[in-house]
Structures are given as structure tokens and as C-alpha cells.
Amino acid sequence: MTPDQLKLLADTEFDRAAHKKNLREAAHAQLTVPFAGGLFIASPTLIAFLGACNEDIVYIEDSYNNPVQADRVELLNLISTTYRDVVSNWYDELQKSNRIRRANNV
């Protein structure tokens, strides 16, 4: 290989760590869920909290530290569905990127 070919190969090498970080950031941006005038981040912690509550109406702090009154079952369903869909898509995209060897295959 000529030096120019080696340089081109090095320039087009796929940066797996950067791509993985970008996929994670994109997924986390999609986990934001508006509900009942508040903004919530879908997470396993929130899902567990809502699942453990027995009340139909909960008062919960949103991501902007404001208290929100919400229907627990509706919020739980929305948060669970959002989390499952986003993480599933993130997983699929990560599996695709694991098969990529060069940047021009992205």
C-alpha cells in the first residue's frame, strides 16, 4: 500500500466509541416524556416507583423539579412503553454498528 492509501484508510477508520456515545445520547434524548403538564425521563427507577405505588393518583416531581399530579397507571404505561421502545431501538442500532468496519459503511 502506498502512504496515500494508508492515510485514506486511517481517515476512514470507524470510530466505534464515538458512534456508541452518539447512539446513547440520541436514545437518552428520546426518553423525555411530557405528561400532565410535567416532563419526565423514562427510566427503570421511575418505572419501579410507579409500579410500587398503590394510589391511583400520585404526586411526583418532574425533571424540572416541579410537583405534578398524575394518573399513576397512565403514566406508568406511557413511561414503560417509551422506555421499552427507545432502548429496543438503541439496542438494534448498536448491533448494526457492531458489524461496521469502516466509516463509509455507516
Label each PLM-derived region with a short phrase:
Residues 1-106:
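A preference for well-ordered globular domain cores
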